[in-house]
From Swiss-Prot:
Residues 146-169, 412-422 have a biased composition (Polar residues). The keyword Phosphoprotein applies. The gene is FAM13A. Belongs to the FAM13 family. It comes from Bos taurus. This is Protein FAM13A. Residues 1-21, 52-112, 133-229, 307-338, 398-433 are annotated as: Disordered. InterPro entries: FAM13. Keywords: Phosphoprotein.
Length: 697
């Protein structure tokens, strides 16, 4: 039974913290609970083991002291007898103290005290092992051991009697530990390589420093008093849970798994509180540990990680799980709305804002401003959503229109060097250039096709090739044909930039410029009866490279008389002819039965009419100017009212003022309003000038 309690003691000691104070207190508690004979046996075994384990010098010094003490004891028998009598008195006094303490500390679970005692056979076996072990020691050690064994032999009978009189569980535990120590000591003679590891065994936790002399092992009355004070401080151990079960199936091993590994290892062992992670890291072929989040998330999720399992739907796998809103952005979760859905949302928001404006106007008798709308959080949200949806609608329409068109390469910046950019961009540009060269014709081929088209058009309309032989209508037709031809060229090759392109296209551009200037010069008509018409010289002809320019001489002023009538007749004739040619020009301008497509319209006739009106104002009298001024003011009020209504509606819908890009639906009205304002300023200047002239005269 003593051998069975020993593993329990070792396992309990494994679970205790290994602090020096606890070790010392545990040692005191064990010593205080044993009998005097057990203490003598403990001192004998400890001295034998220490002499083998510790250094030779210190053990040699101790053995020399012990040999001297043994010699002195053998020489004087009388002194030995007196010392033995004093020791027996001390032991009897100490046994009474221990008996009193055992009555307080013996647990109730130890009902059968006979199981916890050492019998005489075990004592004899212990004596034989001790004598055999000590017999192998050196001469100075043998002298000390023989003296101690003689004391043990003399007190053997007293040992058995004291065990029968005062048995304790701690005594049994101490005896079993000593038996294990002696067996370990016998193994040390065979395996000398495990000396350092056996020092760390839990059965040898109670040991003293080798430098301490052996005299400290002997008990004194002061030490007994000290031990009793320590016993009162150590908490009582409840061993009822361990001793309720009287029999065990298998003995508990003295070493734990981590202790056995540390005994065989060369490195320092880890503490018993080390976590599983350290042991996992020390094992090379171990599987990786699972994170704590795995157990919190649920072990059933491990079956969802296998994508090959049929019962598991795809949306339940972790990699298909939707990200939380805190990790993702709002832009990622936005749904793509179609243009029809965006239009419906815009209309609903506009209705909400309009209802708010009507309610606000009924309450406060004026239309809400932008600050009034911003003060209301709900209306402000509507306004922001409206602007956002409008932007999305615009982008969606632009995206749809871009999908219909072929992709265009981004044009290179002229400020960057040609070496700037990646090789991929250069390769793409080279490929695009090769494709363009293969598709589009050369500049010379395009010019030849344009000239051939112009010749066919002239032949159809019976129009001469020389501009001097053309009438006004033919010049207008030539101008439109040239304009469309040049636009067709620029749509293919762009405006001529290089010197070669300019040289090739120069005759066609010069012809178009000359025709345009002739038409603009013919549109300026002198006014009948105007005194300044006599002094106005015609516009200069365009300067053409390689040709001599001929200029008209200034017309001298004529005196008043019959010559005025001669000037008026050609003026009437010119006016009628110009009006007729202008009408023909407009008719010809609307004719688009040509092979070329023009993206822009020519607005020269409108300029002619504006110039004619302004020149008439200079010749008008003061009453005519005043009447014209009144008409312009009425027209200005009408257009201004129309524009103001448009701006108010825009502000109610969008919550902001009209910007320049928002004036596209009313572009004509804005342009007309600008011209009327300029005309009003001109009329005011003319009237003030006429007033000053009349006053001066």
């Amino acid at each position: 039974m003593a051998c069975e309690i020993m593993p329990l003691q070792s396992s309990q000691e494994d679970e205790r913290p290994m602090s020096p104070f606890y070790l010392s207190s545990a040692h005191v508690s064990q010593v205080s609970s044993v009998s005097s004979t057990g203490e003598l046996l403990e001192r004998t075994i400890r001295s034998a083991v220490e002499q083998h384990l510790f250094d030779v010098n210190s053990s040699g010094g101790q053995s020399s002291e012990d040999s001297e003490s043994g010699a002195s004891s053998s020489s004087s028998t009388s002194t030995k007898q007196r010392r033995r009598q004093a020791k027996e008195q001390d032991e009897s006094r100490h046994s009474r103290d221990v008996g009193r303490l055992n009555k307080e500390n013996i647990p109730s679970g130890f009902s059968n005290l006979d199981e916890c005692m050492l019998n005489a056979c075990e004592v004899e076996k212990l004596y034989e092992n001790t004598s055999g072990y000590i017999g192998e020691r050196g001469k100075p050690k043998r002298q000390k051991s023989s003296s101690r064994l003689s004391e043990l032999n003399e007190n053997q009978d007293g040992l058995v009697n004291m065990e029968n009189l005062n048995p304790t569980p701690s005594h049994e535990r101490t005896g079993s530990d000593h038996v294990e120590l002696i067996s370990d000591g016998s193994k040390e003679n065979e395996k000398d390589g495990r000396q350092s590891q056996h020092l760390e065994n839990p059965t040898m936790k109670i040991q003293e420093h080798p430098s301490l002399p052996d005299s400290k092992l002997q008990r004194t009355p002061d030490a007994d008093d000290q031990q009793e004070s320590f016993v009162s401080e150590v908490p009582e151990l409840d061993l009822t849970a361990l001793c309720d079960q009287k029999s065990w199936e298998e003995p508990i091993p003295a070493f734990s798994s981590w202790q056995q590994e540390s005994v065989d290892a060369d490195e320092a062992r880890l503490s018993p509180q080390a976590g599983r992670l350290i042991r996992q890291l020390l094992e090379e072929d171990s599987d990786p540990m699972l994170s704590p989040r795995f157990y919190a998330y649920g072990q059933s999720r491990q079956y969802l990680d296998d994508t090959e399992m049929p019962p598991s739907p795809p949306n339940s796998h972790p990699f298909m799980r939707r990200r939380s809103s805190s990790l993702g952005s709002y832009e990622d979760e936005q749904e793509d709305l179609t243009p029809a859905q965006l239009t419906r949302r815009i209309q609903s928001l506009k209705k909400k804002i309009r209802k708010f404006e009507d309610r606000f106007e009924e309450e406060r008798k004026y239309r809400p401003s932008h600050s009034d709308k911003a003060a209301n959080p709900e209306v402000l949200k509507w306004t922001n959503d409206l602007a956002k949806f409008r932007k999305q609608l615009k982008e969606s329409k632009l995206k749809i229109s871009e999908e219909d068109l072929p992709p265009r390469m981004r044009q290179r910046s002229n400020t960057l060097p040609k070496s700037f950019g990646s090789q991929l961009e250069k390769e793409d540009e080279k490929k695009q250039e090769l494709v363009d060269k293969a598709i589009k014709p050369s500049v010379e081929a395009t010019l030849e096709s344009i000239q051939r088209k112009l010749q066919e058009k002239r032949a159809e309309t019976s129009r001469p090739e020389d501009i001097k032989d053309m009438t006004k209508d033919q010049i207008a037709n030539e101008k439109v044909a040239l304009q469309k031809a040049l636009l067709y060229y620029e749509s293919i090759h762009g405006r001529p930039v290089s010197k070669n392109e300019r040289q090739v296209m120069k005759p066609l551009y010069d012809r178009y410029r000359l025709v345009k200037q002739i038409l603009s010069r013919a549109s300026t008509i002198p006014i009948i009866g105007s005194p300044s018409s006599k002094r106005r010289s015609p516009l200069l002809q365009p300067i053409i490279e390689g040709e001599t320019a001929s200029f008209f001489k200034e017309i001298k002023e004529e005196e008043e008389g019959s010559e005025d009538d001669n000037y008026t007749k050609p003026d009437f004739m010119v006016t009628l002819k110009t009006d007729f040619s202008a009408r023909c020009f407009l008719d010809q301008f609307e004719d688009d039965a040509d092979g070329f497509i023009s993206p822009m319209d020519d607005k020269i006739p409108s300029k002619c009419s504006q110039d004619t009106g302004l020149s008439n104002l200079h010749a008008a009298s003061i009453p005519e100017l005043l009447e014209h001024l009144q008409e312009m003011r009425e027209e200005k009020k009408r257009i201004r009212k129309k524009l103001r209504d448009f701006e108010d509606n825009f502000f109610r819908q969008n919550g902001r003022n009209v910007q320049k890009e928002d004036r596209t639906p009313m572009a004509e009205e804005y342009n007309e309003y600008k011209h009327i304002k300029a005309k009003l300023r001109l009329l005011e200047v003319l009237i003030s000038k006429r007033d000053t002239d009349s006053k001066s005269m």
